[in-house]
């Protein structure tokens, strides 16, 4: 299901009136722009990692991105460039997967593999992920920024399914791929690849496979809104 369309279900009319007015760019919006009048910037338009090669600084009232930042090669650098597009007094609205709800303590992401280059948390010091960013910290460190709001969005998310299929033992073995011991890394890779190839892809059996609830109508994400001070 389209992520922006799903997210808009939990947004009140005031959200659109306050943040998505004027000149809006939707980075990674594809065929599901956050609002009809948004200018979409996607792969065909250039590399969002270096968006200032294509767009002028301080030229947008709102910079929106949904499930795009996690694909960038250098997360802080991309986030900083996107911020430079915002006019003084404008806003940046960013939605990213929540690492506990989406990745479910599995890295690389079991749904996107290496497509996701980082995971995200919200105002927690520690993370199980080797490549985790606190999106709140990234936001507050932007120049002339004020964080308007930051929230976990979990519409229709069934916490009863969280971590049910990939058991504790399997999770431990999966995490061995980052072990300092070569034997553990190899064993972890072999076990996971065996399950993936023989049970989750080639077979109709899904025993042991984690549940990606965002494949239907659930949200498992963080939304943060930042204002650029005049």
Positions of PLM-derived features:
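Conserved SAM-binding loop
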Residues: 9-13, 19-104, 224-226
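S-adenosyl-L-methionine-dependent methyltransferase catalytic module, highlighting the catalytic core
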Residues: 15-19, 76-83, 91-230
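Conserved SAM-binding loop and adjacent beta-strand
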Residues: 1-9
């Amino acid at each position: 299901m389209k992520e922006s369309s799903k997210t808009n279900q939990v947004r009140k009319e005031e959200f659109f009136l306050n943040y998505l007015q004027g000149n809006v760019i939707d980075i990674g919006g594809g065929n599901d722009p956050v609002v009809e009048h948004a200018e979409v910037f996607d792969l065909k338009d250039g590399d969002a990692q270096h968006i200032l090669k294509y767009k002028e600084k301080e030229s947008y009232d709102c910079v929106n991105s949904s499930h795009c930042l996690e694909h960038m090669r250098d997360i802080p650098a991309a986030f900083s460039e996107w911020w430079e597009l915002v006019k003084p007094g404008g806003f940046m609205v960013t939605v990213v997967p929540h690492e506990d709800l989406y990745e479910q303590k599995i890295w690389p992401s079991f749904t996107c593999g290496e497509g996701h280059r980082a995971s995200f948390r919200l105002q927690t010091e520690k993370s199980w992920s080797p490549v985790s960013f606190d999106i709140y910290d990234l936001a507050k460190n932007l120049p002339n920024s004020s964080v308007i709001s930051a929230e976990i969005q979990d519409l229709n998310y069934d916490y009863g399914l969280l971590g049910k299929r990939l058991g504790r033992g399997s999770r431990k073995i999966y995490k061995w791929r980052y072990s300092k011991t070569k034997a553990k890394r190899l064993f972890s890779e072999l076990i996971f690849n065996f399950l993936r190839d023989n049970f989750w892809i080639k077979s109709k059996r899904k025993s042991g496979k984690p549940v990606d609830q965002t494949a239907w109508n659930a949200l498992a994400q963080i939304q943060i809104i930042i204002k650029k001070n005049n």
